[in-house]
Amino acid sequence: MKITWLGTAAIRLEADGETVLFDPFVQLVGGENPNCLDDFLQDQTICVTHGHLDHLMEVPEFLDPESDAEATVYCGEVAAETLSDMVENTSNVVKVRPGDVIRLGDVRILVMEGKHAKPGKSQVFQKLFSRRFLQYFR
């Protein structure tokens, strides 16, 4: 099994001849992620962990029937609703719930419930006024 971190939340898992991309996201201009969208488009199986844009913003590119990418996207209900607002055709979007098992050849992915951090006011203020965040607005 090979796991490759691709920046932000993006991870590529390779095992038993299968490749799965989790949370594809291309860094905003000026960011530290050296990847571009073309680095992701060869992947045909996408898993989105939750519906925030930094986890699914690039996913519509994989669902574009005019691109060569046309992947199958596994995601929860909220992410699926977000994607349905972003693209016309969601026939390749598969809704999953905690406890579901995604089977890809000999690879099994168990869908688990996750808890997203809920920052308080001080953490939000620190993030919004951090040098790393403000660089995007130069």
Annotated model-derived regions:
Residues 1-2, 14-20, 101-109:
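Beta-strand-turn-beta hairpins that frame and shape the catalytic cleft
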Residues 12-52, 57-65, 118-138:
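Pre-active-site segment of Zn-dependent metallo-hydrolases
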Residues 2-5, 26-32, 91-94:
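Short gly/ser/thr-rich secondary-structure transition/capping motifs
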Residues 1-2, 45, 66-72:
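Short active-site oxyanion
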Residues 8-10, 99:
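Short hydrophobic/aromatic beta-strand or adjacent loop that forms the aromatic wall/cage
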Residues 57-68, 78-79, 84-88:
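Metal-dependent catalytic neighborhoods of phosphoester/phosphodiester hydrolases
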Residues 76-138:
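Metallo-beta-lactamase
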